[in-house]
A protein has these predicted regions:
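Acetyl-CoA-dependent GNAT
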Residues: 4-82, 93-95, 99, 103
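Conserved GNAT acetyl-CoA-binding A-motif
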Residues: 100-112
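Conserved glycine-rich acetyl-CoA-binding loop
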Residues: 80-94, 114-122, 126-127
Length: 154
């Protein structure tokens, strides 16, 4: 498997259709296709490719100001159903956030998670994320979780 940075130039219709399908099949809050495309156009969406199949994708905002003066914010991460429970989400979080280690030293990594999404919360807690008392900008039922970048990638 290989991680690639998605751009409008290298994101084929087939790859984008897979990303939309993964997003639609996650069963929780989903971003519409135009928002997913905007994330790719901005330049911080990574896909884990298993040959021509998207196994996992993650979108990172490297200059988020939602909760701190500046943080790495995980906008979205989704694993295709056939690839779940294989540690791919953990690997993608650590690896892709690690790409920013030099330029974003001493920053926090933040994410919003639905309070009812217990499997995601368990994953994030296992990685060392903690629930913050900051209110989520995504909705009343979402929790903000944080971890120092250095701790996540070590």
């Amino acid at each position: 498997m290989e991680i690639i940075l998605l751009t409008p130039a290298n994101t084929t219709d087939a790859i984008f259709a897979q990303i939309v399908a993964i997003e639609e099949n996650c069963g929780l809050f989903t971003y519409p296709p135009e928002v997913l495309w905007e994330c790719i156009a901005i330049g911080d969406t990574y896909a884990l490719m298993d040959d021509a199949t998207v196994a996992d994708f993650i979108t990172i905002d490297p200059d988020a100001t939602d909760y701190f003066d500046r943080s790495l914010h995980i906008v979205n991460i989704n694993v295709a159903a056939a690839y779940r429970r294989q540690g791919l989400a953990s690997m993608m979080l650590r690896t892709c956030c690690g790409y920013y280690a030099q330029s974003h030293a001493n920053l926090m990594v933040t994410l919003d998670v639905e309070s009812t999404n217990t499997s995601a919360r368990r994953l994030y807690e296992k990685l060392g994320f903690t629930v913050s008392d900051m209110p989520s900008e995504n909705g009343e039922d979402d929790l903000v979780m944080t971890i120092p970048l250095e701790q996540l990638i070590s």
